């Protein structure tokens, strides 16, 4: 079985994670105590991708929860599915990282990391044939960003051949929680570029917009946002957990989605997104789902795919549908909007079909796109970073934890390199191949 070990770090990561496990348990018919109450054998067939079966038929999530302060953990434990998790898998410190990346990565986090790695090893050993890890975290904080990236690099050393995928909440342009977000995010990207295989970029502003515009929620809470993220995360792994006509797993996704190793930041979309009131007035058809999931309004990241070009994308369908229709729709999209796809990667749209839809729906799709437009997000963060770093504002918090200014400069230039790489491939055309090689030789 292809198991996935789930890790959640920091406040944001733990809250997304808690919601994710609610959705996951619901899909597999597991109640908050870990007992199975499902109605179909399909729910049990590959339940051990995410769950471990304990004595007495209890299903326990393969989840590791870490934080540098006990607060969020306590609320997860007190939440509806708090009793589901294995108590030993809660690893937390007492001090907190205080939104300081250096504390999470170098001081406080480094003290706690060994106990987290012990739990990771335990979970990995209980797997039959582990496929990889998934981490939910934010990039703007201290624990999720600093300690999360530290954990990724440690796991990378120990399990170099396993897929590492992250669901990273990027600081959004309008909704800011802390002043030092640009610092934390830039330092995190510096790590993720090197050590992760695929990063699903999410941000709160785009999620707010979806809740507000599409779902017609007047006052969206973090719970609503996290529910959207959870739906998308479940969609990216459904083919591992349920039978399908065209399967897709984390590694297949990575191979098909990442044309150049550094460019592994994806935008995620989900369909159908309709407000609760208008659900019954719309027919869910494959064309409608396809059209919706390519729509810029459905992207969970505040970058507009129309401003860039898709290097690759994958559409993961769920539900009973004809594969012929899916293929037709995919062709249709590529032919109609061919200018949005780079022409030097033929067949760069991958579709997969999983037969079991999410709870309460007949069909759904998750969209994962590797578009050059994601550079907008990094550009924005880099600009904010530069403005503060030029004045060395707030820098003493980081140097006080033993960081060097040089590290900031490196992270900044790595971020700028990433942006210009995206731009280079956005401008590249199929017949320019020769010119590129010459440039590289001269350089």
Curated annotation (Swiss-Prot):
Similarity comment: Belongs to the tubulin family.
Swiss-Prot/TrEMBL GO biological process terms: microtubule-based process
Identification of the protein by name: Tubulin beta chain
Organism of origin: Thalassiosira weissflogii
InterPro entries for this protein: Beta-tubulin_BS, Beta_tubulin, Tub_FtsZ_C, Tubulin, Tubulin/FtsZ-like_C, Tubulin/FtsZ_2-layer-sand-dom, Tubulin/FtsZ_GTPase_sf, Tubulin_C
Necessary cofactors: Mg(2+)
GO molecular function: GTP binding; GTPase activity; metal ion binding; structural constituent of cytoskeleton
Location, primary (coarse class): cytoplasm
UniProt key word Transcription regulation: no
PROSITE patterns: TUBULIN, TUBULIN_B_AUTOREG
TM spans (from-to): none
Record-linked CDD domains: beta_tubulin
Binding residues annotated for Mg(2+), in chain numbering: 69
Oligomer status and interactors: Dimer of alpha and beta chains. A typical microtubule is a hollow water-filled tube with an outer diameter of 25 nm and an inner diameter of 15 nM. Alpha-beta heterodimers associate head-to-tail to form protofilaments running lengthwise along the microtubule wall with the beta-tubulin subunit facing the microtubule plus end conferring a structural polarity. Microtubules usually have 13 protofilaments but different protofilament numbers can be found in some organisms and specialized cells.
Subcellular location: Cytoplasm, Cytoskeleton
SUPFAM superfamilies in the cross-refs: Tubulin C-terminal domain-like, Tubulin nucleotide-binding domain-like
Record-listed GTP binding positions: 11, 69, 138, 142-144, 204, 226
Keyword line: Cytoplasm, Cytoskeleton, GTP-binding, Magnesium, Metal-binding, Microtubule, Nucleotide-binding
A Pfam cross-reference name: Tubulin
Role summary: Tubulin is the major constituent of microtubules, a cylinder consisting of laterally associated linear protofilaments composed of alpha- and beta-tubulin heterodimers. Microtubules grow by the addition of GTP-tubulin dimers to the microtubule end, where a stabilizing cap forms. Below the cap, tubulin dimers are in GDP-bound state, owing to GTPase activity of alpha-tubulin.
GO cellular component: cytoplasm; microtubule
